[in-house]
Amino acid sequence: MPERDPILLTPGPLTTSRMTRDAMLRDWGSWDAAFNRLTKSVCADLVRIAGGGDAYVCVPLQGSGTFAVEATLGTLVPRDARVLVPNNGAYCARIAAILRRLGIAHVELPFAEDEPASAHAIDAALARDARLTHVALVHLETSAGLLNPLDDIAAVCRARGRALIVDAMSSFGALPIALAASDIDALISASGKCLEGVPGMGFAIVRRSALEAAEGRSPSVALDLHDQYAYMQRTSQWRFTPPTHVLAALRAALDQFFDEGGQPARGARYARNCATLVDGMRALGFEPFLDARAQASVIVTFYAPADPAYAFPAFYAAVRDAGYVLYPGKLTTADTFRVGCIGALGADEMRGAVAAIGGALESLGIAMR
């Protein structure tokens, strides 16, 4: 018998539905009118989910979410700008690394890995340095599962007259975001996260006026969002070979997203998954890294067992043998591992994951204390 697909307890790629996978069985011509309509419908729905309205446009881009982050920063941020980067994890640090490579001045505002970015501290930083023109914020720092207070920070940026660019890679579709109401300049996410598509397409939902002002600014040909959007407006086509099957899967995933009840229902299911997971893991003796007030219901970081018998590779393999795939830790201050709560999963799968983890502890002789 063929091996059953493992359940991915990761923040993307993730376990997808049969309907989403089946959508990839058809081949599409990248210049065909039917595929152009598919692109248009997906982009319209992404703007709708973001609460963007007519003032915003969606620019899809081939590649991972990081491709879209770099494309957005390289296109929207002028070379003489100065960007504030609140930093409480690896994905915030990645934004700083991109800005460094682009030659754009930036200031990192450090926070602990378990500390949400403070809107008050950001306000103070903007008040101290009038040269700061933009804030680049990670909404949900996936290295810990930490939720940053987007609405409060957006209000500070609006009051200070600074542009706000949001990496919503692991929050878009699961958490409420009101793009136009928050006056955000750009929001970035990807197909293979909380929308429950497959990896391979990033996208930016950008204020139309900001994008139109960015002609010729990007130092890259392939990552130029302005040129990508302008070409799509003229031709209804992608500039370069599109990820046709990825887009078709995302169309199917979006249909299921709306059938489920949109963001409120998706977020509620993930919250149930998260609560089921945390309760079960605590019963085994594990403790979450984050305080519950800072924890997003997308991925949970747990402290690793202190027992010398614990080693993540063997622990991972034992859980994998039981049909579940964990995610390694990505923190600098503690030995941890991560368990995702997203994908085409419910509370039953989370209970199964807890049982698999308990079985791994027993089989490896790991004592929890």
Curated annotation (Swiss-Prot):
Query: Which biological process terms from the Gene Ontology are attached to this UniProt entry?
Result: organic phosphonate catabolic process
The record's listing under InterPro entries reads: Aminotrans_V_dom (IPR000192), NH2EtPonate_pyrv_transaminase (IPR012703), PyrdxlP-dep_Trfase (IPR015424), PyrdxlP-dep_Trfase_major (IPR015421), PyrdxlP-dep_Trfase_small (IPR015422), SP_NH2Trfase/AEP_transaminase (IPR024169)
| Superkingdom, natural source | Bacteria
EC number from the UniProt entry:
2.6.1.37
Task: Name any one GO molecular function.
Answer: 2-aminoethylphosphonate-pyruvate transaminase activity
Q: Enumerate the PANTHER family for this protein.
A: 2-AMINOETHYLPHOSPHONATE--PYRUVATE TRANSAMINASE
Protein known as: 2-aminoethylphosphonate--pyruvate transaminase
